[in-house]
């Protein structure tokens, strides 16, 4: 079976989305700490207030400037839902919110499994923009320009993708690296017995 016949059947999972949320106002973190349950605020340790949601399982770091860093969402939809719940909770406890929050995704971290074995030595030799030092780290680090992401590629065909700003960039990057690795003859099918061990 030639590598051109290796089928593309990845599994891609979004693991974490980190976003900034901007409110066009300053916030009184002391008042929020006093009125909203289950909030952590210790300005001697950290300048932001820590607000954890259980559903979806997201953490927000809220700063007095009105900026928030929201982390833990597994999709853009879940991120928006979490921000709406945070704003609703703030309003419920008497915190006046002016205008709509501005949400900007800073980083999407995803994992993928190509279901092929990857010859990393060959890939390191043939791919540009990569770093591979197996004595230091077992994965090949590949910097992709379009979309602008970093992929950690392992010989098992598993990978971690960081730096995406949109979910579709993750799928695009995984497809693009698979096609490039197949074109360079760096992938081979996993044998039936190997797949059963997973």
UniProtKB/Swiss-Prot annotation:
GO biological process terms, semicolon-separated: DNA-templated transcription initiation
UniProt KW keywords: DNA-binding, Repeat, Transcription, Transcription regulation
Ranges for the Sequence repeats: 14-90, 105-181
Domain of life: Archaea
GO molecular function: DNA binding; DNA-binding transcription factor activity; general transcription initiation factor activity
Keyword Transcription: yes
Family per similarity comment: Belongs to the TBP family.
Name this polypeptide is given: TATA-box-binding protein
Provenance organism: Saccharolobus solfataricus (strain ATCC 35092 / DSM 1617 / JCM 11322 / P2)
């Amino acid at each position: 079976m030639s590598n051109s016949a290796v089928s593309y059947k990845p599994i891609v999972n979004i693991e974490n989305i980190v976003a900034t949320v901007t409110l066009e106002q300053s916030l009184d973190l002391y008042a929020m700490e006093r009125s909203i349950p289950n909030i952590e605020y210790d300005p001697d340790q950290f300048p932001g207030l820590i607000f954890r949601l259980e559903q979806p399982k997201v953490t927000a770091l809220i700063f007095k400037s009105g900026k928030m860093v929201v982390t833990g969402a597994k999709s853009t939809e879940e991120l928006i839902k979490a921000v709406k719940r945070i704003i609703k909770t703030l309003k419920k406890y008497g915190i006046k919110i002016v205008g709509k929050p501005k949400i900007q995704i800073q980083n999407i971290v995803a994992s993928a499994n190509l279901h092929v074995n990857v010859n990393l030595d060959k890939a390191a030799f043939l791919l540009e923009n990569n770093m591979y030092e197996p004595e230091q780290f077992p994965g090949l680090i590949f910097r992709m320009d379009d979309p602008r992401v970093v992929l950690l590629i392992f010989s098992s065909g598993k990978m971690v993708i960081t730096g995406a700003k949109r979910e579709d960039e993750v799928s695009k990057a995984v497809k693009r690296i698979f096609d490039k690795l197949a074109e360079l003859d760096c992938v081979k099918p996993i044998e039936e017995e190997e797949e059963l061990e997973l």
